[in-house]
Swiss-Prot record:
Protein name per the record: Uroporphyrinogen decarboxylase
Molecular function GO terms recorded: uroporphyrinogen decarboxylase activity
Protein family according to the UniProt entry: Belongs to the uroporphyrinogen decarboxylase family.
Native source species: Streptomyces avermitilis (strain ATCC 31267 / DSM 46492 / JCM 5070 / NBRC 14893 / NCIMB 12804 / NRRL 8165 / MA-4680)
GO cellular component, one term: cytosol
Binding locations of substrate: R38, Q39, A40, G41, R42, D87, Y162, S217, H331
Catalytic activity: uroporphyrinogen III + 4 H(+) = coproporphyrinogen III + 4 CO2
Biological pathway: Porphyrin-containing compound metabolism; protoporphyrin-IX biosynthesis; coproporphyrinogen-III from 5-aminolevulinate: step 4/4
E.C. number(s) listed in UniProt: 4.1.1.37
Record function comment: Catalyzes the decarboxylation of four acetate groups of uroporphyrinogen-III to yield coproporphyrinogen-III.
Keywords, sorted A to Z: Cytoplasm, Decarboxylase, Lyase, Porphyrin biosynthesis
């Protein structure tokens, strides 16, 4: 049973009545809940201290370290949810893909997947492959109490892009070439990745995660017709795989203004919106029955407190008519952000939206 489910007795579990989960369920909230993508990361001096000398992938596999890093922004900023500290390529590493995260570059895959024979590299993910995730989440839920923990994974398209390109890419030429040139191989690749991603999310939910977010970082590179035909079936498969757990499912990608409706249609309960589309317009594109998450421009955090508050007020005003709203940035926290700016932002949103 997940931390979001009501037990058979009808009594809610610790996180069920949290502002974050209520907003995800489009229920009335005491205040607009706030959390930040990449809230556990390089913007925090305490993060830099505990990560010193430890490679990224190794840090994702040490349960006590993962728990500490995940908790840091909750302690410092009073955010309404924690997000599990990991990286989207962790499940790929766990099944034996030869990859590393290079500082200043990102994930680099030694042998890109571009042929049918290459698909053999993608075996099933088992809970034993990521036992450190289960252990870390057990530690976290014991510490977090009533604060929900968000589990996450990379969406099939974004994982495929890393695997096919061999690393980060601006234009995704190899990825699109495979998608257009060999549609059946592409579909089989995404289907395998959907199975791996689903298994990774199930491990997190069964360990105690209260919600999950599917990050499709690169999907904004696609036209809507290509998304619907070549990507959406795999994302839908992931959302359907975890539907029975009853936890909110969040879907986010960057530059996805033209895809918002389809991303909701794929099976998300909450659609994340970047800073380019006002939330009232995003709601029109997504349609009814979905909560929205977002969408302050992260760059404003480098401006004055007054500017941050003005832009935040614009986001809150645009969200005023929404059924459910989780406040977030429109992308991850930039590494050089002043952490005090984030603490002030959380306090401002809580104060301004107190019911």
């Amino acid at each position: 049973m997940s931390a979001n489910d009501r037990p058979a007795t009808g009594q809610p579990t610790a996180t069920y009545e949290s502002a974050f989960l209520k907003a995800c369920r489009r229920e009335p909230v005491p205040h607009t809940p706030v959390w930040f993508m990449r809230q556990a990361g390089r913007s925090l001096p305490e993060y830099l201290k505990v990560r010193e000398g430890i490679p990224m992938l190794e840090s994702c596999m040490r349960p006590e370290l993962v728990a500490e890093i995940t908790l840091q922004p909750v302690r410092r900023h009073n955010v309404d949810a924690a997000i599990y500290f990991s990286d989207i390529v962790v499940p790929l590493k766990a099944i034996g893909i030869d990859l590393d995260i290079k500082p200043g570059v990102g994930p680099v895959v030694e042998k890109p997947i571009r042929t049918r024979a290459d698909l053999a590299q993608l075996r099933d993910l088992t809970p034993e492959d990521v036992s450190y995730v289960t252990e870390a989440i057990k530690l976290l839920t014991a510490e977090l109490g009533e604060t929900p923990l968000i589990g996450f994974a990379g969406a099939p398209f974004t994982l495929a892009s890393y695997l096919v390109e061999g690393g980060p890419s601006k234009n995704h030429e190899h990825t699109k070439a495979l998608m257009y040139g060999d549609p059946q191989l592409w579909a089989d690749l995404l289907d395998r990745l959907a199975e791996i991603t689903s298994a990774f999310l199930k491990v997190q939910i069964e360990a105690g995660a209260s919600a999950v977010q599917l990050f499709d970082s690169w999907v904004g590179a696609l036209a809507p017709a290509d998304y619907r035909r070549s990507v959406m079936p795999a994302s839908t498969k992931v959302f359907q795989a975890v539907e029975s757990y009853g936890v909110p499912r969040i879907h986010f990608g960057v530059g996805t203004g033209e895809l918002l409706g389809l991303m909701g249609e794929a099976g998300a309960d909450v659609v994340g919106v970047d800073w380019r589309v006002p939330l009232d317009e995003a709601a029109r594109r997504v349609g009814t029955g979905k909560a929205l998450q977002g969408n302050l421009d992260p760059a404003v955090l480098f401006s004055t407190t007054e500017a941050v508050e003005t832009k935040t007020r614009e986001v809150l005003d645009a969200a005023a008519g929404l059924e459910g709203h989780v406040f977030n940035l429109g992308h991850g926290v930039p590494p050089t952000t002043d952490p005090d700016a984030l603490t002030r932002l959380v306090e401002y949103v809580h104060t301004q939206t107190a019911r």
